């Protein structure tokens, strides 16, 4: 009987929860601000983890770059807190990656909304 989920998937899910809590409560770096953990991918041997993050309310590229630098600087501290919170033989090395999918999704949603408004305005003019 095969398992429904791989162990790396379960670890990634738990890691996402723990890192979100740690970033919210423990990390005091002002560069980080309102950060959201959107996804976590863990390697099969659980040695590496890619943490995909987005910054809420920040569209400025320089603010995002500063936030990413802050996360990279805090990475060893976050890893140590993850090690205390989760019972793992090997605590994964954390790599933070900026996730643009949320920003792109909002942009696409705005484009669709604008097209719908323009289409409705044209139909009202024709009547």
Swiss-Prot record:
UniProt key word Transferase: no
UniProt xrefs under Pfam families: RBFA
Organism domain of life: Bacteria
InterPro entries: KH_dom-like_a/b (IPR015946), RbfA (IPR000238), RbfA_dom_sf (IPR023799), Ribosome-bd_factorA_CS (IPR020053)
GO cellular component term, pick one: cytosol
Keywords assigned by UniProt, alphabetized: Cytoplasm, Ribosome biogenesis
Location relative to the cell: Cytoplasm
GO terms assigned for molecular function: ribosomal small subunit binding
GO biological process: maturation of SSU-rRNA
UniProt family annotation: Belongs to the RbfA family.
Subunit text: Monomer. Binds 30S ribosomal subunits, but not 50S ribosomal subunits or 70S ribosomes.
Classification via NCBIfam families: rbfA
Function in brief: One of several proteins that assist in the late maturation steps of the functional core of the 30S ribosomal subunit. Associates with free 30S ribosomal subunits (but not with 30S subunits that are part of 70S ribosomes or polysomes). Required for efficient processing of 16S rRNA. May interact with the 5'-terminal helix region of 16S rRNA.
Protein name: Ribosome-binding factor A
UniProt source species: Actinobacillus pleuropneumoniae serotype 5b (strain L20)
